[in-house]
Amino acid sequence: MAARFFADVPMAAGATLSLPDSTARHVQVLRMQPGQSITLFNGQGGEWDASITRMGRSDVDVCLGAHHASEREVGRSVQLALGMPANERMDWLVEKATEIGVNSLQPLHTSRSVLRLSGERAEKKQNHWQSVAVAACEQCGGNRVPTVAPVRDLAAWLKTLPPASAEQPVLRCLLSLADGTQPLAHALVDLPDNAAVCFLSGPEGGLSAQEEALAIASGFSRVTLGPRVLRAETAALTALVLALNR
């Protein structure tokens, strides 16, 4: 099986192109040579056969072959908005959420967030997490890379959400341990096939009561994953699996 690489450039059968710097570095690290076959995808759908034609000191040229309209994506659009877990656990969550099939991720600051980011540091983290998502797609066979959005405060992000409509139905689920909360599996039973899902998950310790109330006022409904208290990243990934495999 040929090694897979993401390249954010236009592609056409028979074209010769120079790989973007980040992709070229990846090819060079693997010590690949001219004549070797690789697979390229650009996030626009499907993937391309390609052959390395030249290896420079810092650049790599390839010739594109056939396009394969293969898609390994799930049919439903699912967004995950979450209070960021600490340190490397966010990297792991982005990687696994991408492998499962999330469409977009929204990192959030909440009242109980341990990880706090702003300015240049926030931008660097966003770019890093986007790179983690790219690498996960290269590994798992996905041809559409999920978007990792800039870090936002929860309240500010909630204000940006568009209203759901009959043409674009959205189920907005707040992961909660509050008494009387309906199981997520029940909320998904009658979900139309064309409906998107947006999950809001808190950091360690969950969202505060005030934050949950703010989310509910913005159209979210509380759902539970069961009686056990799951780690922040475990809860988020469990919800994704249930929504994408109902």
Enumerate the language-model features and the residues they cover:
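RNA substrate-binding interface of SAM-dependent RNA methyltransferases
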Residues: E71-C173
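Non-catalytic positions within long, well-ordered alpha-helices that form the structural scaffold/packing
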Residues: Q28, T98-G101, I216
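Active-site/ligand-binding-proximal alpha/beta "capping" segment
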Residues: A164, P169-E211, F220-T224
